[in-house]
């Protein structure tokens, strides 16, 4: 009986929309849940390889031994590293090297790539970067003097797992064993060194140790993991993750709305059937069995189809994201399935319980009186309760993210606008005198049922707003990535350029038709005072290390001025706005620096917005020309070259002390990552658009049912098919235009919060929204309305349906 009734009811368009909306909700949560779960497991494994540890502690001096012993007591593996710069010698040839001394456990995770393969820094031997070997004309098996120690060269170090990217690292790498550091005599009290301690273990061990350690850290010490990475790739991937979360949120919101509209419409369309069944003797228990059984079959079918679609989406996304994921991802846990099925159940209960209760409570009297509706769970109580429950569940699912609050803020603004603009529209229409008959009929229809008009306006506006949000943000992400990696980005850095080499280097590059980026002088100094107040004790990382300063007459293109005036004059400086906010520095304040030779001061006269994600030189402070002349300085520049290694070899021979840094591989990796992620985002746009179209169809279908009886009356009074179709077209076009206008205001509100607080984009009003949304809304709804209307007014079908 239940199966037969379900199969007969299955042909109802409303029930089909409910099934599709629930299926898409399951698919969205399952696909993103599975990918997130697998990526979290796989990337946590990969991230430890990028760091050669699960966590790291950085310090300018050796930490107490008790800290390391405590870590070992808790079951953590502990590794030590020490980095410093010192002079090395091959015979009488000197060369500054960046020394990295490691213990026997290094690397804790990941691979140290060497030539020959499989080498590790053993006591008495060193590994040299190929550039250092070339500069000193050395080969494997030779010896090199590092300070007071003479060590054997075991091979070349090609790639370190935890090397990172630093264009200001002036000297080539030399890797040695920590046991040989004392023999070199290079590290003395007061020497500038950096200690890094790597820790490995499970999350419980790491979290426990972190809670024990953090209260004891000093300002110059930093505890971090890979999630603190703020590089170009790290920030881009974070934005991509936020976009995927936003896609999931919008899909769920649209699915909830579509199920609510379609479920309500389906149950209303079955009031007469239930009333007839009751008059024929059907008991409450029998009807409950039929209705609940049918509902369970819809949920089961939605779970099966949604699960299949979700797994398909997961596989598509995994193929698209394959180049940016670890080679082998572990399987997902059961949690995504529980979340997906739980989401489906909660959505169905929240929006389906009241319509089904109303259906079950239908009175037999409705057979005689069409306006009899049971009074169950008044909307004035039910809607606020459902809204609060939905927000709490979404907050739990999204982790209280700013994404959720921004979208909800946009929805609230949109709801208020719908009320205000809707009433304004109705009042304007009431006063208008129209000559066109279809327009007059359309306007009279909208005025006759104001609450129905406002509810349709709200649903259409919500659909358009959420779709606009997604499409605009996707465009912003892609634009941002293209700005970050323009086609002519420099792929080589030249660093450690002496002042006397600048002119001959420019001539060399010009000879090879190379146009370099700006030449930046680099001076290392420590910020020691702000308005004559010492900065000691301040925990900001920028105050606990030497900063790279520069002077420029021309403002860098990627550093727009946000306050003050450019260029700085004598005894003035331009400061990065983020650091100024963190240190509470305002225009007119004085900052004091200690360089290698002397102390110097400057007044802050401008603040710049610095794009730290760009693979270009960036500086906290830019001085005017001549301000840093008393300090030792080197220079750096960058250029693009794609014509082979001949020029690069000639450059190395002619300027052996200049370091050449090839970032082409980094650019290629970032470009591939962003290309693949953008494809994955397109898949999510398709998913959200499908949900949006379902909501539009559901709402248009509801509108058509309300118009059905009126169409019969008009047709009986002699109205032609063309007039009816034109009337429907005009009515839906007006609804679509106003919905698009309201959606544009709501979308701008949400975008202002999302762009500024979540995606870290500068917010700018998008004029295209104000044109595209109203026009698209009018076009889409007139097409949907016209298509369904054409089916309604076709021949005798209109009367046949009415009679039925």
Curated annotation (Swiss-Prot):
Keyword Amino-acid biosynthesis carried by entry: no
Question: Where, by residue number, does the polypeptide cross the bilayer?
Answer: 15-35, 243-263, 301-321, 333-353, 381-401, 403-423, 453-473, 680-700, 734-754, 769-789
**Superkingdom in the source lineage:** Bacteria
Report how it sits in the membrane.
Multi-pass membrane protein
Q: Which InterPro entries match?
A: ABC3_permease_C, Membrane_comp_ABC_pdt, YbbP
What Pfam families does its record include? FtsX (PF02687)
Primary residence? membrane
One GO CC term on file: plasma membrane
Protein keywords: Cell membrane, Membrane, Transmembrane, Transmembrane helix, Transport
Instruction: Tell me the compartments it is located in.
Output: Cell membrane
Which PANTHER family does the protein's record reference? INNER MEMBRANE PROTEIN (PTHR30287:SF1), MEMBRANE COMPONENT OF PREDICTED ABC SUPERFAMILY METABOLITE UPTAKE TRANSPORTER (PTHR30287)
Task: Name the family.
Answer: Belongs to the ABC-4 integral membrane protein family.
Name the UniProt record assigns to this protein: Uncharacterized ABC transporter permease YbbP
- Upper lineage: Bacteria, Pseudomonadati, Pseudomonadota, Gammaproteobacteria, Enterobacterales
